[in-house]
Amino acid sequence: MAVEFIFLFMNNLNKSTKTILLFILLFLGYKFIALSQPQLTKSKPDLTQSKFYSNSRPWTRWWWFASEIRKKDVADNLIWLRKNGFGGVEIAWVYPINRMIKDTIHYTPRQKWLSPEWSAMVTYAKSCADSLGMGCDFTFGSLWPFGDINVPFDEATMNMTDPTWRQEIAASWDYPKKGYVLDHLNKDAFYHYAFRTGNALKPALIGSLSGLFCDSWEVETKHLTTKGFNEKFRKRFHYDLVPYIDSLYSKRMPYAAVRYNYMKLLSEYVIENFYKSFTKKSHELGAYSRVQCSGAPCDIISAYASVDIPESEALLYEPSYSNIVASAAGLSGKRVVTSETFTCLYGWPRDHHSEEQTADLKLLADAIFANGVNQIIWHGKPLNPAGEDTVKFYASVHLGKSGTLAEELPAFNNYLEKVSENLKKGVSVSKVAVYLPTEDAWMEGELPTEKQFIWAWGAYEHRYSYFPKELKAWRPMWINSEFLEKAEFSNNRLKVGDFSFQACYVDVKYMDLTALRRLTELAQKGLPVCLKQIPAEPGFHPSDAEYKILLQKLNQLKNVKTSWQEMDQIGPLITGTESTDFWCRETADGLTLFFANPHSQGLIFPLEYGQSLNHTTDSIRIAIHNKGSTVPYTLVFRPYQSLLIQLGSDNKISIVDIYFKPKTPVYIKRPSVEREKWEVLSPKQQTN
């Protein structure tokens, strides 16, 4: 309340008096406000019960370019964010600005990385955020991925084709000095890195609960290895990996089968030694973990399920990808799904920078809400000198008073807050679990050239894993081998985490023996299974005998069908939704349903400038099937509007007011070019 009172008081002052008062407040460091805040200790944080966020206001990534960070700048930026409807920040430490022009001659003065002076400024930022009623998370390193100039050669990322190679990190806080990327498969190396990084952040973790953040993978993944990997591989699979290394990414046999075994072991290293270790260390420091597992060479559902807050990303990942993240959250009982949002909205690296249109942002936000996200993290806000807005980050929509978004920010953020708040209530609802084709992706290896980006080559990322269209009315969720194993079938429901499924849908070329074994067990207990095709066992030296027996047992069961049309005992959730994406949450009071405007369907990177332009009203007739009753309803989508409705336990529908009308966008068709900056040359193009 103190800060809100100060804002109201200052609004009635003239400019010069306001400036003097602000300077006094900044000089005092907000200590008189901070002292009034409860100083919580988190030596034993109860993260199992934590809501993590005190409200649903959107957050933003907050880039600190390597420089001499000043208290008055920190406070000024936070005040601006608070006034514009933001609920928190995620501090991300990056290179000095002169790195953008590849200047390696002129050194930018800055607090030394992880030094007491650096820690003091970070702690000040946290105390300012606390005083403003804002949250504050911290990236657990500088730039992406984890690594710095203190990582020794023998604890850096390794490649099995060249023992002298280590991945460098060249654009960190210490630029122009170069360091090494941490060996993410080496638990000891991680804890050495985490010890010094965590110690520097400890003072800032006093106060309100904070999160430690890990961005998307961005470790060189091809031929990734670590000490002892080959020996463990030989022990696990009873053959030597070395003879197959040179052709490990070939689609031919036996290399595809060997690659599956390699990916299976690599996945265990990534999840056990990195993601679980990161979450454990976060808890030791009294923080929660918030992680983008996207791009990691592992079982992606298990990875996302191993962290406290799984985070998606858009639009470098399509909105549909968020279903994987939200599925992992529901399977593991997590209630918050965040998203790094609006990244490279119109293209990479900086198309239409600072000219973004709110209507386009809303189009994307609605798409990810309908695919499971319930907390927005803007991408983002650079730390600027007090009173200025001259520093900008390239791969971002721009948050600042000089950007085109500034006028609409408070109202738009209020909209994002309302939707997020409602989509956090209760648990997500789905009628059918769909087996994610992880084995298929690992066997496939590289994506076709036309589907690759210069930063993404592998099918293992699941960028193009989509739900079957025939399942839309049942609001499917993904499941994997781990959660089939954890699930229990009782009272005609497959129960795991927050979900209570009525059936399992399997349409994969390959399925691991452990998954097939568990699927057969569940089907024998009565679980309805739609087995669209007969899978084969992946990997080199498979155990054919047991696999064939399990397939025979599975196919002989009456509750196992080969087409979804035969699964007529599984009633849908909502019919008539072919042209709108939706999300459903259930509370004791009934269902909360978010329906995205039909124009939000099928968004892909990049968005065209003004793609959201819309002058039409769309009406869609749906039927909600709930607890034995069918409730018909007509969805009326006015231009730029999505809908949030509540279906009470009495099956009566009420409308939640989330109306926000952005400025009418200007449409500019994207120029046609032979090849975009992010596209990969095909083999034919490379030879021309």
Residue map of PLM features:
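A short, compositionally biased domain-edge/stem linker segment
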Residues: K42-Q49, L416-V419
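Carbohydrate-binding surfaces of carbohydrate-active enzymes
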Residues: W59, R70, A75, G88-V89, ...
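Short, intrinsically disordered, low-complexity segments enriched in Ser/Thr and Pro
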Residues: K83-M100, A257
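Bacterial Sec-dependent N-terminal signal peptides
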Residues: M1-T41
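Acidic/aromatic-lined carbohydrate-recognition and catalytic surfaces
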Residues: V94-K187, Y191
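Mature N-terminal segment immediately following signal peptide/propeptide cleavage
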Residues: P45-G88
